[in-house]
A protein has these predicted regions:
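Loop-to-helix transition at the N-terminal end of transmembrane alpha-helices
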Residues: 43-63
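Hydrophobic/aromatic residues within the transmembrane alpha-helices of Major Facilitator Superfamily
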Residues: 23-30, 60-63, 67, 144, ...
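Helix-loop-helix hairpins and the membrane-proximal interhelical loops
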Residues: 1-49, 166-167, 208-305, 449-450
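Residue-level signature of catalytic and energy-coupling elements of molecular machines
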Residues: 19, 39, 123, 202, ...
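Juxtamembrane transmembrane-helix boundary signature
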Residues: 58-79, 110
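Membrane-embedded alpha-helical modules
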Residues: 93-213, 347-455
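Helix-loop-helix junctions within the multi-pass membrane cores of secondary transporters/permeases
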Residues: 2-36, 57, 78-87, 91-139, ...
Length: 455
């Protein structure tokens, strides 16, 4: 039955491989169930309701991904988009969270229309092959950066980022939590790399679990001491089961009356959500598909329409349930690295999101320094694509360099793509190669430039 549904043999995979990939993807992104309520509740939304809405919307989106495209991508509430929702729309602009949810709903519906009319597919295919490679490499750099941040190997400093100091940690009392977490993360990275070299199946998942277990042992021995003020909690689950929170406080909470009286301002908010959602999704899909060799010889992804439609439907459903924009997660690459090639990986991740509603005390105990090693190693694997960039052709190579570096520097996939597009187009025009740029590329470049003055 599973063979008929997901064409496993045709895609060179097995049920076991897909299940391991789905579990690995889930474990690397389960943090969103803790982080999304923390961010969105700043706007006044009920945290418990947000957690339930996020889990259910994520599961539905993952199931849609499997049904519409048979691809191994997982979806959940997008980071950056939830911060924009809470801190910009509801914070700086001062709009009620019901208005922000309405904007997400409208954005999702527009997204569905764009997907059904092949607009997003045209955008995907308009991106030059070299930039697609750069996007994959840039995402690798980006998620590795997220990994070292999550483990607090890199911390804020006078130079914007700096290395965690064990000496300072011992002096100020943070070593027993933050310092131990850094060491355990490093052990996790080394463990995953060794298992990768040895060809161990499920090395990402085993690396995460090993790091977590070592952390539990350290806590039992008094080496690791929880420090909630720094975000370091007990690694030992206090419970295994809990009943899901009601979504009633956020379900279908829209404010269409406000939209009618503030149409222009509302349109700007919708455009911001739509812009970031479209290009974050495209960037993630390009990066993950490129890593898994899913792109054809022309750099196009078969069944891209289904992938994009699943993302759009997920956003719409998420808004109805009461969460911010649902988008394809870059952590999907961890499952793909484990061999995930079909929608069975997505289904597995989706089921685990539903299970997490009842096992949230267990899943939420896994610390970020245990999942960080997986992100760092996946970043390394994705950056291997850098050899496919034509470095001898500066007109193509420099925009790729800009795209790669700006993803990390701007802490945004879509911003990296924007800088890559703009530099690619301008350099080709100035060097007399304007005819190599498609009309759609010119239009998108113009929109990227306009975006910097609107959002």
């Amino acid at each position: 039955m599973l063979e008929k549904l997901f064409h496993l043999k045709e895609n060179g995979t097995t049920v076991k491989t897909e299940l391991i990939a789905g579990v690995t993807t889930f474990i690397t992104m389960v943090y969103i169930l803790a982080l999304n309520p923390s961010i969105l509740s700043v706007s006044g939304m009920d945290a418990g309701s947000i957690l339930t809405a996020t889990a259910v919307a994520s599961a539905i989106a993952c199931f849609c991904m499997a049904a519409f495209s048979n691809m191994p991508f997982a979806l959940s509430a997008g980071l950056g988009l939830n911060a924009y929702f809470a801190y910009t729309v509801c914070g700086v602009m001062g709009y009620p969270w019901q208005v922000a949810l309405t904007a997400v709903l409208v954005e999702g519906i527009i997204f569905i229309i764009m997907s059904l009319t092949s607009v997003r597919e045209a955008i995907f295919n308009a991106i030059p092959v070299q930039l697609k490679v750069a996007v994959s490499v840039g995402i690798g750099f980006f998620i590795a950066f997220i990994g070292v941040q999550n483990a607090h190997i890199i911390v804020d400093g006078a130079t914007l980022v700096s290395l965690y100091s064990f000496t300072s940690g011992i002096a100020n009392g943070t070593f027993s939590s933050q310092g131990v977490g850094v060491i355990l993360c490093m052990i996790g990275v080394i463990s995953i790399v060794i298992m990768l070299i040895k060809g161990v199946k499920g090395y990402m998942l085993w690396g995460i679990l090993l790091t977590w277990v070592l952390g539990i042992i350290c806590q039992l021995l008094g080496i690791y001491v929880p420090n909630p003020e720094l975000g370091y909690y007990s690694l030992i689950p206090t419970a295994f089961f809990s009943m899901p929170n009601s979504i009633a406080p956020t379900f279908f909470q829209f404010d269409f009356a406000f939209v009618a009286s503030h149409l222009a301002n509302f349109a700007v908010v919708v455009f911001a959500f739509l812009f970031v959602d479209v290009f974050d999704t495209l960037g993630t899909v390009i990066g993950c598909a490129s890593k898994a060799n899913m792109l054809d010889k022309d750099g196009k992804l078969p069944r891209i329409k289904g992938v994009l439609l699943a993302d759009a439907v997920g956003t719409t459903v998420g808004a109805i349930l009461g969460t911010s924009t649902i988008t394809t997660f870059v952590e999907s690459s961890s499952g793909i690295t484990e061999g995930g090639r079909t929608g069975l990986t997505s289904v597995t991740t989706g089921i685990l999101f539903l299970v997490a509603l009842f096992l949230s005390p267990l899943f939420l105990t896994i610390p970020s320094f245990a999942t960080a090693p997986a992100l760092i190693v996946v970043g390394f694997l994705m950056m291997q694509q850098v050899v496919n960039i034509e470095w001898n052709d500066i007109t193509k190579a420099f925009p790729c360099f800009v795209c790669i570096t700006m993803m990390g520097f701007a802490y945004s996939i879509s911003e990296g793509i924007a800088f890559g597009f703009i530099s690619y187009t301008f350099i080709h025009v100035i060097t007399g190669k304007a005819k190599e740029i498609s009309l759609l590329m010119y239009i998108l470049t113009g929109l990227f430039i306009l975006k910097f003055f609107i959002i």
